[in-house]
C-alpha cells in the first residue's frame, strides 16, 4: 500500500465501484495479495480503528466461553456490532457472499485494506500476533458460515481449491456413514447438503470431534464444516503475512504519524468521546446517591475516599474529576465540590493556590485550553495505585480477599460475588465490571463496559433517568493523536495523551500565573485522538 501524505480536506472515500467489484468480488477473501492502491493517512487511521473495534467485538464474545457460531454467540456479536456502529460488517457476515450492492462492495474494500493495515500493528510480538490471528479466524468463520452451497463452490473455485462436491451416485455409496456422522441434521436435510471428499489430515479438528465420516484415509465433509479446511489455509496466509509484515515495518514507520498510530493501536480507546456531556446536568448534591446506584466500582471508591479523607492524590483527582465532568457536573459545581471537601483539612487560600487552577485546566478554561476526555477502562486498568492511592481499576489492583469484602459491603450475595470473581480471576476485569452492573441493576443483559462514563450512562438508562441513544448510531469518526508541534486545533484532546501535552501546559501555566501544584506528569498512554495535517 502507498500512503499519500499531503494535506487534504476530510471527506468520505468513495472508490469507483466497477473497479472494486473486480478487485473484491466476494465477502469472504483469503487476504493473499497485499492491496496496491494509494491510501491517505486519514483513511489509514480510520480503517485501523474501525477494524480494531470489529475485532474487539469478537474478543468480548470469546471471553464469555460461548461456542463460536452458536446462536447465543451470534446474538451477542450482532448486538455488539450494531451498538458499535458496524452494521456494514454485520451485513458482510450475514448476507450472500457475492452481492453487488455498492455499500457491500465498499465494505469489502474496507475489510481487505484494514486487515493488511492491522498486520503492520500486530506483527510486533507473539502475543499480539496470537490475539490477531484468533480474532481474524473468528471473523473468517463468521463470514464463511453465511455462504450458501452455491457461494461456497464459487469461493473454492476462485481460490484454487481442487475439491468438488460429491455426485449423487458418490453420496449414495456412503450415505449410511453420512447419516451417522452428521449431527443435528435430519435425513432429509442431509440429502440436500453438499459433501466434499478430502484427505483426513486436512480436517483433523473435525476428526477429533467425530464430526465427519472417515473411509480409506478420506474425510467426507459437509458444506457447513468445510470452513475447517479452508480456514486452515486462511490461518496459514495470515501467519505468513504477519512474518512478511515484520520486514515492512521499518520502511512504513519512516513516517512518524504512521509509526505513532501502529504502536499505539492495540491499547487505544475506540469508544464514544465523553469530553462533554450532552445529556442532563448532574448536581453535586446527588453524587452521594449516584455513587451507590450508578457509578462503577473505580469511581465509587474514589468518591468514598474523598468523603472519608477530604483529600485524594493527583492521579485520583484526575480520574474522578474528569469522570465528573463527563457525566455532566458543571465547572462551577465541580469547583464547589472539591473546595467543600478539601477545605475541611486546609484553608481556602491553600486550596485556591494548589488545586483550583487544575480544575479549570481539566475543563479547558485555563493554560493550554485543552479539554481533556475522561479516562477509558483501558487507561484505568493500566494505572497501578500505590500506598494511599485509590485510582486505577479495583478489579485488577485489589487482592481477591479485599475485593470480595468490598463487594459484600456493597450488598452482593456470596453467589453474586462468585459470578463477578469468575471473570476477575481470569483477568477479564471489564467483563467482571459488566457482571457487577447486571447484578446490581437486575438487568437481563450484561452490558459491554469499556468506559466508566459508559457504565454511568447505561445505569441511568436502566433506571429510567435518561433515554437510550438511537440503536446502531455510528460512534465518532476515528481520530488520531494530535501533532502537538504543529498548529492544528488542540481544543479537544484525550486525557490519555499525557506527558508531552502536560509539559507544554506547565510551561504556559508558569508564564500565565505562578502555580506549583500542577507539575506531576501523567503516565504515557498513546491513545488515538484528533489531528489535522
Swiss-Prot record:
Expressed in embryos (at protein level). [4Fe-4S] cluster binds at residues 298, 377, 393, 433. Keywords: 4Fe-4S, DNA replication, DNA-binding, Iron, Iron-sulfur, Metal-binding, Primosome. Regulatory subunit of the DNA primase complex and component of the DNA polymerase alpha complex (also known as the alpha DNA polymerase-primase complex) which play an essential role in the initiation of DNA synthesis. During the S phase of the cell cycle, the DNA polymerase alpha complex (composed of a catalytic subunit PolA1, an accessory subunit PolA2 and two primase subunits, the catalytic subunit Prim1 and the regulatory subunit Prim2) is recruited to DNA at the replicative forks. This is DNA primase large subunit. GO terms for molecular function: 4 iron, 4 sulfur cluster binding; DNA binding; metal ion binding. It comes from Drosophila melanogaster (Fruit fly). The gene is Prim2. One of its GO terms (cellular component) is alpha DNA polymerase:primase complex. The keyword 4Fe-4S applies. Residues 480-490 have a biased composition (Basic and acidic residues).
